[in-house]
Amino acid sequence: MANKKYEIRYLPTFISQFNNILYYITYELKNKIAADNFYNEVVKQIEIISNAPESYEVYKTIKDEKIKYYKINVKNYTIFYVVKDNIMEIRRIYYSARNFDNLI
């Protein structure tokens, strides 16, 4: 049986956070090549997981969430997403060393 491809939806919060990270790498660290590589890697990994997003790690939050969050790591960052029907909703991206419990 073929894997079902999920529609990818990026929430504005994720887009804003991702743009801030890319800006930081490009202008603060002065490394446009690293920013481009990071952008490409994030997009690639999201495309890959969209084939089977529910097979990735579930994030166990301390909050009583009714929504099941999944997470993937790309370089030093963690991306959080949820799955609703045939939609994979990309919600947040954080530096992996952060404590996520109060953020998700």
Predicted regions and their residues:
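Compact soluble domain cores
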Residues: E41-E47
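Generic beta-structure capping elements
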Residues: L11-T13, A52, I93
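Secondary-structure transition/capping residues
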Residues: I25, K32, D36, P53-K60, ...
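Arg/Lys-rich, positively charged N-terminal/basic patches that mediate binding to nucleic acids
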Residues: M1-E41
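Residue-level signal for pocket-adjacent positions within structured domains
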Residues: N3, E57, Y95-R98
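A short, surface-exposed loop/turn module that caps and links secondary-structure elements
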Residues: E47-N73
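Enriched for short, Lys/Arg-rich terminal
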Residues: L29, I67-Y70, V74-T78, V82-I104
